[in-house]
From Swiss-Prot:
The lineage of its organism: Bacteria, Pseudomonadati, Pseudomonadota, Alphaproteobacteria, Hyphomicrobiales. It comes from Brucella suis biovar 1 (strain 1330). InterPro entries: ArchSynthase1/Queuine_TRR, TGT, TGT-like_sf, tRNA_ribo_trans-like. This is Queuine tRNA-ribosyltransferase. Residues 249-255, 273-277 are annotated as: RNA binding. Belongs to the queuine tRNA-ribosyltransferase family.
Length: 377
């Protein structure tokens, strides 16, 4: 049931795992949720109707890419990102900070914000906490992120602490800039690298700001999975139980299962779409590389039990041919399959938490991956 206000309700718990709903005027997001990434206003190789039919309640838009092209002001003139891109449900936008730190050229960072040159044409821009919130407002997203500084791991402790403290000050400025917007939310972002005391400090400070939701950033950036999970075990018990928790940029199906077990409610990642464009399929049997010659004369589908036409109705031989030939349809079908599998996984997770058997579901799912793909013909 939609609401004129932003709200989150936990409907069931199984250990630290939570099943619930985020309510917004544009729709309800069932959690745990996976958000397909629509970097430049499109989920690559997919129609928006397909994305919705697969079970996605919310998608992600990228502030950095959209501010550069076509421009936030232009999107606003065209009715906002929902109207512009044809997605009627909720949209979450990131702040642009991660891309500024990783993609932009000649960046200069100080207390005020960050100046940088576009990776597209070299044009100079300035991003401040206030400007980030302004851009996200022009895009008219439903959930907005604070501007933060994300350090690459490994990072010296002194540098990690400096970035974390700066991100906290920027969170305060973003909160002021966001103000009171009924039906929308701004999330703070917990930083602190792989250092527990810094993560604790960040989580406690953001909790004191009484924001509508909380993200965990700066993970899944090359560190071992155990480090990511250790940081979640530090952060999640600190964050308010009545607010949603979003792990940014994560991840693999295994990452998702283990993060849900530690109390995370929301995820996004380019992995299913990017992998689909490179010939890799996610299935109940684990990852399947359609480039491999073993599929060249295999008449079987990826998964005969799947509800997704891409997974069920096309032979592996045909998918192999499309991938090897560089045909656009190959990327489209494998992206469709991958997003279908991710939403199938999330649906199973939600049902398992509601039924109190999340541990059994996790064991059965991981056993399926471990058994591997069906034998070659």
């Amino acid at each position: 049931m939609t609401t004129e206000n932003f709200g989150f309700k936990v409907l069931a718990r199984d250990g630290a795992a939570r099943q619930g709903e985020i309510s917004m005027p544009r729709g309800v997001v069932r959690t745990p949720a996976f958000m397909p990434v629509g970097t430049a206003g499109t989920v690559k190789a997919m129609y928006m109707d397909q994305v919705k039919e697969l079970g996605a309640d919310i998608i992600l838009g990228n502030t950095y890419h959209l501010m550069l092209r076509p421009g936030a002001e232009r999107v606003a003139r065209l009715g906002g990102l929902h109207e512009f891109g044809g997605w009627k449900g909720p949209i979450l936008t990131d702040s642009g900070g991660f891309q500024v730190m990783s993609l932009a050229q000649l960046r200069k960072l100080n207390e005020h914000g960050v100046t940088f040159r576009s990776h597209i044409d070299g044009k100079a821009y300035e991003m401040t906490p206030e400007r980030s919130i302004e851009i996200q407002g022009l895009l008219d997203s439903d959930i907005q992120m604070q501007l933060d500084e994300c350090v690459a791991l490994p990072s010296p402790e002194k540098n990690t602490e400096r970035a974390m403290e700066l991100s906290l000050r920027w969170a305060e400025r973003c909160k002021v800039a966001f103000g009171d917007q009924p039906g929308k939310a701004m999330f703070g972002i917990v930083q602190g690298g792989d250092i527990a005391r810094l993560r604790e400090r960040s989580a406690e400070a953001l909790k004191a700001m009484d924001l509508k939701g909380y993200s965990v950033g700066g993970l899944a950036v090359g560190e071992p999975q155990e480090v990511m999970l250790d940081m979640l075990e530090v952060v999640c018990p600190i964050l308010p139980t009545e607010k949603p928790r979003y792990l940014m940029g994560v991840g693999t199906p295994d990452d998702i299962l283990k993060s849900v077990a530690r109390g995370i409610d929301m995820f996004d990642c380019v992995m299913p779409t990017r992998a689909g464009r490179h010939g890799l399929a996610f299935t109940r049997f684990g990852k399947v590389n359609l480039r491999n010659a073993r599929h060249a004369e295999d008449h079987r589908p990826l998964d005969p039990q799947s509800d997704c036409p891409a997974s069920r109705d096309y032979s592996r031989a045909y998918l192999h041919h499309l991938v090897k030939s560089g045909e656009a349809l190959g990327a489209m079908l494998l992206t469709w399959n991958n997003l279908a599998y991710y939403q199938y996984l999330m649906k199973g997770i939600r049902a398992a938490i509601a039924d109190g058997n999340f541990s059994d579901f996790t064991a059965e799912t991981t056993e399926g991956w471990a058994r591997g793909d069906m034998p070659a013909l």
